[in-house]
């Protein structure tokens, strides 16, 4: 099993209301991948960080294998969510992948 954890910072020019809407859209889009991407075991997006956080949201996923994670990265459904709901609104992305 492989964990794939992403932290994002949203663009500064977004208002608080826009950030809330973007976070909700990202959560809906990414959690909606459950059952649609082979090898994706679990997916959770946390959008309610404490004020002390330096990231705005976190993706926490579990995959059957490193190969499943690699396939996910180019899966058309994932790419559509990333291109439509994530990349246009984020300024920074941090990733940690590890075996469990």
Protein language model regions, located:
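Short S/T/G/P-rich N-terminal loop/turn motif that feeds into the first structured element of a domain
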Residues: 1-56, 64-74, 97-100
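C-terminal structural segments of small proteins and small subunits
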Residues: 66-94
């Amino acid at each position: 099993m492989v964990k794939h954890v992403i932290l994002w910072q949203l663009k500064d020019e977004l208002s608080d209301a826009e950030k809330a809407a973007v976070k909700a859209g990202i959560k809906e889009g990414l959690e909606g991948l459950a059952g649609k991407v082979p090898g994706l075991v679990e997916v959770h997006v946390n959008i309610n960080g404490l004020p002390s956080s330096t990231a705005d949201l976190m993706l926490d996923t579990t995959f059957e294998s490193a190969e499943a994670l690699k396939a996910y990265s180019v899966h058309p459904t994932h790419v559509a969510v990333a291109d439509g709901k994530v990349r246009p609104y984020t300024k920074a992305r941090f990733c940690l992948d590890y075996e469990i």
